[in-house]
């Protein structure tokens, strides 16, 4: 792949990504990188490119704020799915492996350091949060239904009692 093709590919990846995480991959073997790519598959792609080409692609997309992360052996994690699950996977891999270092991230147009990625990894997944919201909503709806139906059932009992007495 030529440098122009690499920049074009990076521009496409960066512009389509919901979030971007920067990692240092110094010391990781090819097998470890392959394992990391497999771990991230579906939610993100793990790209390694020359920092100069990544910087050019970032400028073309309009991301000028994360040049600080493009020093040393830097890989780009382009998040297509849930940022929380990607952050959890990266943290788990970094803890297990010990060589992967998270440099920072770019989420919703803002640049954050590695601590933000660690905090994202501590959040519950999107599915768990949605399940909790559904549970709370269901409980509130059940309570509201009980409040509405209680007077109606009381009135029905009064009518049945009146019918039985007359």
Swiss-Prot record:
Forms part of the ribosomal stalk, playing a central role in the interaction of the ribosome with GTP-bound translation factors. GO terms for cellular component: large ribosomal subunit. One of its GO terms (molecular function) is large ribosomal subunit rRNA binding. Part of the ribosomal stalk of the 50S ribosomal subunit. The N-terminus interacts with L11 and the large rRNA to form the base of the stalk. The C-terminus forms an elongated spine to which L12 dimers bind in a sequential fashion forming a multimeric L10(L12)X complex. NCBIfam families: PRK00099.1-1. Pfam families: Ribosomal_L10 (PF00466). InterPro entries: Ribosomal_uL10 (IPR001790), Ribosomal_uL10-like_sf (IPR043141), Ribosomal_uL10_bac (IPR022973), Ribosomal_uL10_bac_type (IPR047865), Ribosomal_uL10_CS_bac (IPR002363). Keywords: Ribonucleoprotein, Ribosomal protein, RNA-binding, rRNA-binding. It comes from the Bacteria. CDD domains: Ribosomal_L10. Disulfide bonds: none annotated. One of its GO terms (biological process) is translation. This is Large ribosomal subunit protein uL10.
């Amino acid at each position: 792949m030529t440098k122009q093709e690499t920049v074009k590919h990076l521009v496409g990846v960066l512009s389509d990504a919901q979030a971007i995480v920067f990692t240092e991959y110094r010391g990781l073997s090819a097998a470890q990188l392959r394992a990391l790519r497999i771990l991230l598959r579906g939610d993100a792609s793990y790209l390694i490119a020359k920092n100069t080409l990544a910087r050019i692609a970032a400028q073309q997309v309009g991301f000028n704020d994360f040049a600080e992360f493009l020093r040393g052996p830097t890989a780009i994690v382009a998040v297509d799915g849930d940022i929380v699950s990607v952050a959890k996977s990266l943290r788990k891999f970094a803890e297990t492996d010990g060589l992967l270092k998270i440099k920072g991230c770019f989420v919703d147009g803002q640049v954050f350091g590695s601590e933000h990625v660690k905090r994202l990894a501590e959040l519950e997944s999107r599915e768990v949060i949605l399940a909790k919201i559904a549970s709370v909503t269901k409980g509130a709806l059940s309570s509201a239904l009980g409040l509405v139906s209680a007077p109606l059932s009381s009135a029905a009992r009064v009518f049945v009692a009146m019918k039985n007495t007359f």
